[in-house]
UniProtKB/Swiss-Prot annotation:
Gene3D superfamilies: 3.10.50.40, Trigger factor ribosome-binding domain (3.30.70.1050), Trigger factor, C-terminal domain (1.10.3120.10)
Native organism taxonomy: Bacteria, Bacillati, Actinomycetota, Actinomycetes, Micrococcales
Subcellular location per the Swiss-Prot or TrEMBL entry: Cytoplasm
Name of this protein: Trigger factor
GO MF terms, alphabetically ordered: peptidyl-prolyl cis-trans isomerase activity; protein folding chaperone; ribosome binding
Organism from which the protein derives: Paenarthrobacter aurescens (strain TC1)
Known role: Involved in protein export. Acts as a chaperone by maintaining the newly synthesized protein in an open conformation. Functions as a peptidyl-prolyl cis-trans isomerase.
EC number annotated for this UniProt entry: 5.2.1.8
Amino acid sequence: MKSAVENLTATRVKLNVEVPFEELKPSIDAAYKTVASQIQVPGFRKGKVPSKLIDQRVGRGYVLETAINDGLNGWYQAAVQETGVRPLSRPEVEITEVPDPSATDGELKFQVEIDVRPEIELPDYAGIKVEVAAAESSEADVDKSLDELRGRFGTLKSVERPAKNDDFLTIDITATIDGEDIDSAAGLSYQVGAGTMLEGLDEAVTGLSADEEAIFETTLVGGDHAGESAQVKVVVKAVKERELPEANDDFAQLASEFDTLAELREDLAKQAADSKVVEQGVEARDKVLDKLVELVEVPVPDSVVEEQIEAHFNPENAHGEGDHDTEEHRAEVKANTERAFQNEIILDAIADKEEVDVSQNELIDYIVTTASQYGMDPNQFAQIIDQSGQVPMMVSEVRRRKALAVVLGQAEVVDSEGNKVDLTDFVRPAGEAAAEEAAAGEANEEADVVASDDPAAVKF
């Protein structure tokens, strides 16, 4: 078999494939067996019909067509391996020549057009310079954290006054189009200012007391009437405010392991400082990635964008957002898809150059972390991703993160005050940090999760 690559664009190629008759013959023999098992001829057992009789009954052309259809994917995959292209889209195949059915020689020729991963040229990424905000926490940050903690222990109390921002309401709503009620709901709980229901609702309920109502115009964002303008009547049934417990030593003992408010505030101050450092690292990471995308031109195949948009807005998809299918939303999905693709291509290229690999420990760390984000047991989550064939995808994700950490570790990062920012802890692999903790006797075992570099020790 011979194959050659013809570059059509930076992201699309045409494979020209030639399969000689001697390589086609095994598929023809297999096709005869397939056809023999499908037809019945008096005097012959099923599957034992001679080739010549099959030619008489269904024609050798049909057998040849079956052989080509059954073998095409294998020859395509062989051509991909031979040429080294990395397909991104479904192949578009055109058969340009087939052997004469009446002859015992000739060639099968076909062409395949596919989108492929683009080849890029990496710039010198060592010493990329970025500026981030200074990691400064304040008493205001501590007060905010303390108020959030108090809010978790707060209680709701009905009040006899007009509603204001942050109040909690019980409301009934009815949506009307052209005088016809098209939807309604009663007894809904809503926090003023949350902005999680209908546009215009916050303005409508602000200033209303219990048993008062308002009517406002809005554009519906879901259901059968998504995108249509509707008149909405909202009736406030109750207005409540959240009472926060007093911040004192008693509260500190209730809400934490500390005995005094001073100790609790000290701990919250440390958390705020640590959070600012993490925010600084995240900002540096994002800006370094922005710089990489600026430095490298990565063409994005149309098929990548089209498939993502189709999946995103497919109403049959559990995660589809058909109700929000607008030009603005499509443009947003397109931009996000293009950026994600560019990130992947650049980071994969850096990982190749830096010879980044992924250890079993690092993969398990990532699985455990991801499982916790979904609120799942790590072992159960690992089993699910293994059964769905997503382990290679996760390995690639860890590899890209490590590649970005390499670039970030070589970057020159300063804060807004000109101070050099040390990102050592931020870019250090989680497995390395865990190893240090274990050596110091501080590591906690992950329940029932094996962490080993021995692949046989991990059961997915």
